[in-house]
């Protein structure tokens, strides 16, 4: 199988946009990939690794400048569901999604991440809802700036407390409830939309896109994937008692695009310590303030959000998208991201099915 020929065939020589999951589904139907349905319902340790072929397939596509850029463009387009829901949100200013809620408050759309029984962890139950919420916030004409924060949780250890998020749901991962494609849909999808906005079909996302500034407010902690998200934000507020970690080594996976983005904030040495040696970064430390723009006492976070919204919108937001594009041109153009994701697609597939991942989950996290 030549993945590039398959991609050109399924996308009609790159004139048709297909999301990662739809692309792989059609490739399975055409006999180019094994059907991962045979592994559905099995715990991770019992899977037959049928999804490894998806990793090799997507790595080859993303490694090609033409096909890879087209796939990145596809994943930056709004979901079909988002275009339908945007109109109702425009009228009501409120929307509920699996794993997230969206509320317009003055000039801001406030997106609250919610998976209360799992410390707001990310999994298959939150993925589509989260991306749809991001789309709707960016599409809303009455919104000038977006705010991202975690909701209150019900987990016994932190019941009633607002938390930013605990990263990937390790229990679901161990139980085999998170597929390999979850990583690619997430990082090519809503996480990249935080950073690049929404693409338009008729023009490169490098040239034109639908963008708004994003403000994050960190209560408690931002672990793993939630720390990765902070690296895409335009402004981050954190509580003084909050902390950040990227326990990728202890989990046994690649931490999204953090290996690409974190060194820009804290330098190579600290980034490697965070990823390879589980360095915990207090938000109120010198290193934490390289990621967090403002650190305040927990009871003052709400006021800090309001103040920041006014600060970023007080003179209008006409240049916000232009400045975001200019920063990206110097820091992370789409082609750099594409090349990183080609490596990520291949390496994460091997990590996801590694016996070491199972061992780490059982030993370090005691999941069942």
Regions found by a protein language model. Give the residues of each.
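A structural preference for short, pocket-lining loop segments at secondary-structure junctions
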Residues: 111-112, 129-211, 215, 235, ...
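Crotonase-fold acyl-CoA enzyme core
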Residues: 204-317
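Extended acidic/polar regulatory tracts at the flanks of large eukaryotic scaffold/adaptor proteins
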Residues: 118-119
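C-terminal alpha-helix plus adjacent terminal tail
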Residues: 1-106, 153, 282-283, 303, ...
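Hydrophobic/aromatic residues within transmembrane alpha-helices
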Residues: 111, 148, 169, 229-230, ...
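Short, aliphatic-rich beta-strand segments
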Residues: 105-115
